From Swiss-Prot:
The keyword Glycosyltransferase does not apply. It is found in: Mitochondrion membrane. The chain crosses the membrane at residues 1-21, 29-49, 59-79. GO terms for biological process: ATP synthesis coupled electron transport. It comes from the Eukaryota. GO terms for molecular function: NADH dehydrogenase (ubiquinone) activity. Belongs to the complex I subunit 4L family. It comes from Formosania lacustris. This is NADH-ubiquinone oxidoreductase chain 4L. Core subunit of the mitochondrial membrane respiratory chain NADH dehydrogenase (Complex I) which catalyzes electron transfer from NADH through the respiratory chain, using ubiquinone as an electron acceptor. Part of the enzyme membrane arm which is embedded in the lipid bilayer and involved in proton translocation.
């Protein structure tokens, strides 16, 4: 494994561990998801450059579009839950009670 692959793999694993262990606030969960998506985008872009094919070049742009949608919907959900529940702590949020 090259150092480049190791750095992107470790960035994804750190984001996943942050999502699993530090789930106290919704904002920290959204930031961990954003870090995971960024490491996936860079890894997918490098993978597309390695194969030098035009068929693989659309995958990073599609992932970037989905991560932009996630990044724009996240703060809206954060504001909505803070207004309705009074907090953004994930322990107090229950989707069955909404």
């Amino acid at each position: 494994m090259t150092p480049v692959h190791f750095s992107f793999t470790s960035a994804f694993i750190l984001g996943l561990m942050g999502l699993a262990f530090y789930r106290t606030h919704l904002l920290s969960a959204l930031l961990c998801l954003e870090g995971m998506m960024l490491s996936l985008f860079i890894a997918l872009a490098l993978w597309a450059l390695q194969f030098e094919s035009t068929g693989f070049s659309t995958a990073p742009m599609l992932l970037l579009a989905f991560s932009a949608c996630e990044a724009s919907a996240g703060p809206g959900l954060l504001v909505a839950t803070a207004r309705t529940h009074g907090t953004d702590r994930l322990q107090n949020l229950n989707l069955l009670q909404c």
